[in-house]
Design a protein with these regions (language model features):
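C-terminal accessory regions of radical SAM enzymes
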Residues: 126-223
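Conserved SAM/AdoMet-binding glycine-rich loop
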Residues: 5-111, 120
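Hydrophobic, well-ordered secondary-structure elements that form the walls
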Residues: 22, 76, 114, 135, ...
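C-terminal structural cap/anchor segments
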Residues: 105, 112-117, 126-127, 131-134
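Short catalytic/ligand-binding loop motif for oxyanion handling, primarily in non-cytosolic enzymes
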Residues: 29-31, 121-124, 155-158
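Structural beta-sheet core signal
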Residues: 50, 114-116, 149
Length: 223
């Protein structure tokens, strides 16, 4: 950990910049604790943000420590805010644990951005509405401050990509790409037309981010 903070100090001396973005896919909480302690021990004045996994390890005490050391924001994937689908994709978190994590972060002055997903195989329209409702409530309570929806993409190394039958999906013929062949085209019987939800999800979230639209019925966003 001292090496990381040594490099931070070197970059500050070289550039004069004191803001840092750590690009780990999900920074380990234990590592972040050590980082915060080292920053505070050296009395550095910095700001930083990173990607995290929303789990119960982020206690109020840890989030206070992170904030005190200069952490101003985190981003993490809530993905589908549906208990059934979260379990299906083996996310390893629950709605309840993620919410508690977000609460601890936000109450300590750390901005929370979350990545959201729709169109996972077997997901229903009702589950999509329920997910949007949970996201609305998180914004209303001030537990998240920014969010972005993306359409589910099946990748070759994911559990669903390796075993599509487990989510009632089938691989389709893939046209080779000279750059990369990570994403796998797939099909699902009786799948909703997810494309008709894209604009509504974006518009709803845009409003929630600005603390408006909480009283709009969920289905009205998709008219």
């Amino acid at each position: 950990m001292k090496i990381i903070v040594d490099r931070m100090e070197a970059m500050i001396a070289e550039t004069g910049n004191t803001g840092f973005h750590f690009v780990d896919e999900a920074a380990p909480p234990a590592l972040l604790r050590k980082l915060a302690e080292e920053i505070l021990a050296r009395k550095l004045v910095v700001t930083y943000w990173t990607n995290v996994r929303f789990d119960k390890t982020y206690t109020a005490e840890l989030c206070y420590l992170l904030s005190k050391s200069g952490c101003i924001a985190v981003s993490g994937g809530l993905e589908v805010a549906s208990p059934r689908v979260l379990k299906l994709i083996n996310k390893g978190v629950t709605i309840e644990s993620a919410t508690e994590c977000m609460r601890n972060l936000s109450e300590n002055g750390i901005m929370v951005h979350t990545y959201l997903m729709y169109g996972f195989p077997t997901q229903t329209e009702k589950e999509l509405y329920d997910s949007l409702g949970r996201v609305r409530d998180l914004f209303a309570e001030g537990l998240i401050h920014s969010a972005f929806w993306h359409r589910y993409a099946m990748t070759c190394h994911s559990p669903s990509g390796r075993n599509p039958e487990s989510v009632l999906a089938r691989h389709m013929t893939q046209i080779p790409n000279i750059f990369a062949n990570n994403e796998i085209p797939f099909e699902v019987d009786n799948e909703p037309d997810w494309s008709r939800f894209t604009e509504g999800l974006n518009v709803a979230t845009y409003n929630y981010m600005r603390q408006t639209g909480f009283d709009v019925p969920l289905k009205r966003w998709f008219r």
